[in-house]
């Protein structure tokens, strides 16, 4: 008998799968080299097309020149640098009027890591997480690797707000979290205030009925680029 592979097949399949977004990005790069990037409209990866604010660059240069190397390049506390968490909490409280403190802030290397931690925190294997179509395809592996199951609520095709009829039908006792993404990738839709209020009311009602909290996880990488 030959040697048996000890690699996890499910993970191998995930890594070998093709990403349409990456394929589009590679095609856009190739076309840009052929006809000039200014002639290519690239709707694949969400890379910014505007320069970094000068204030940010100046601050980074200042820190590199004045901070101790270990402070900049050494290990940070597990929850993140305290002063950074304090600054974020202060900013959120100022902007949204909610009593955030540093104890409410957990730093992660990007939204993917933060979502993965959140899913692991609120689910056990076999639990369900609901999200709404259309959705960012990477949600599937983030949830799958926890042992939970991602269930997708079909869209309201008229306006891509939440399809509440389908949502309430799928919101069973097995659901431990609901994942929203607004502004939405890929539709660009922003959930209205009435939509979000109705969603919150339903989750409160069902949490009470089922005897456990149904968490609302909000993925907001595009929150700052909402244009009127």
Please give the residue ranges for each predicted region.
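Short, Lys/Arg-enriched N-terminal segments with co-localized hydrophobic residues
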Residues: 1-5
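N-terminal small-domain helix-loop-helix segment of the aminotransferase-like
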Residues: 7-110
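Short, internal active-site loops enriched in acidic
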Residues: 46-49, 221-225
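Conserved core of the PLP fold type I
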Residues: 70-211, 217, 223-228
């Amino acid at each position: 008998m030959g040697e048996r592979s000890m690699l996890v097949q499910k993970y191998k399949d995930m890594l070998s799968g093709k990403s349409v977004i990456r394929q589009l990005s590679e095609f856009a790069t190739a076309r840009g080299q052929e006809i000039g990037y200014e002639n290519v409209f690239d709707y694949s990866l969400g890379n910014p097309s505007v320069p970094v604010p000068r204030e940010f660059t100046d601050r980074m240069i200042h820190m590199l020149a004045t901070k101790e190397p270990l402070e900049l390049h050494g290990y940070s506390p597990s929850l993140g640098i305290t002063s950074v968490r304090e600054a974020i909490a202060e900013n959120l409280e100022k902007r949204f009027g909610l009593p955030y403190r540093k104890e409410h802030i957990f730093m992660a290397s990007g939204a993917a890591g933060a979502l993965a931690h959140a899913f692991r925190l609120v689910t056990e294997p076999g639990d369900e997480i609901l999200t709404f179509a259309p959705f960012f395809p990477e949600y599937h592996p983030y949830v799958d690797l926890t042992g939970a199951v991602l269930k997708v609520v079909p869209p309201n095709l008229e306006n891509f707000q939440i399809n509440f009829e389908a949502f309430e039908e799928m919101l069973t006792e097995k659901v431990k979290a609901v994942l929203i993404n607004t502004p939405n990738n890929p539709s660009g839709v922003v959930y209205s205030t009435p939509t979000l209020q109705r969603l919150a009311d339903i989750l409160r009602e069902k949490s009470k009925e089922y005897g456990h909290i149904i968490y609302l996880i909000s993925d907001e990488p595009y929150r700052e680029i909402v244009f009127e």
